[in-house]
Swiss-Prot record:
Belongs to the MnmA/TRMU family. HAMAP family: tRNA_thiouridyl_MnmA. Catalyzes the 2-thiolation of uridine at the wobble position (U34) of tRNA, leading to the formation of s(2)U34. This is tRNA-specific 2-thiouridylase MnmA.
Amino acid sequence: MKKHRVVVGLSGGVDSAVTAHLLKQQGHEVVGIFMKNWEDDDDSEFCSSRQDFLDAASVADVIGIEIEHVNFAAEYKDRVFAEFLREYQAGRTPNPDVLCNAEIKFKAFLDHAMRLGAEKIATGHYARVRQNPATGLFELLKGLDPSKDQSYFLHRLNQAQLSKTLFPVGELHKTEVRRIAADIGLPNAKKKDSTGICFIGERPFREFLNRYIQHAPGPILDDRGRKLGRHVGLSFYTLGQRQGLGIGGVKEKGAGAKAPSGQPVRGAGDHAPWFVARKELETNTLRVVQGHEHPWLLSHRLDAQDASWIAGHPPAAGACAAKTRYRQQDAACTVLAAQGDAFNLQFPEAQWAVTPGQSAVLYDGEVCLGGGVIAAVNG
């Protein structure tokens, strides 16, 4: 194996720590970088970047590598957070982690690493990279641990980025990663995995969003136009949402609910839960339906835009598989058309709560082909 100078993104978590250890064990020259992507609020009790850096520094000390603290907060605000706010203001539900990977971790961080003389970068993502011997193209593969696979969040990476990237823990299961961390005495071996959006931390999402987006309360209507309550602002809701609707105690209003066809809704009735089905920006109305299988929650087709293809070109029309949300099982689909930065997918089985703003990511078996942002859905 050729030895490289590798710059590892050390987050303070166990996955990136084991990544650095494995690479050093393989004989590479390893340097760690801690990326600060969000400026802590002066009085915030939620942001943990200071502690994360201390954890990363402790890891670097145990492994025996240098670590540098680099601030990418300005780049993050311009390239990721601004788009995040625009999408919410437009009534969509964005996925900032996808954009963060493409613009910060594999662009700003990669550029910085190259200036340091790195030949490769590495992160603790659960994914794999290989070079196809027939085409010479680099491919992004799912991580071997299906419960931790993060290829969905990496689908916007291009050939140049993948050619410089290593994902050592993508070849392992999470249990193996924690075992390795414990065996070599890493101080963060039992550290809890990070969850949620990095710049929000553990604070309530509604509280955070309320600081940046103007909102207007409005009516909550069911599929027959009956008023069930008031929402606090459309930006605070997403399709398929069940919790936090504030319409408990109105179960009798859904009894006998029917689909637009006039047929009773399966699962609707006195005790069926309510779900967000539509956000009508023109009238500032939140539409909810009762029952998990309500037709308004199901769709067979989606249109996507702002597509990015790992091979540099869209896949041919035909059979494929796709995810429309993280941790979803691959769903069989047909690529109806894929031209430029737009594509259309048709699903033989109805998909539940497909959400504009989220990513539709295509797969050919274990190979991630790329994807785009869901723009519209159709029944």
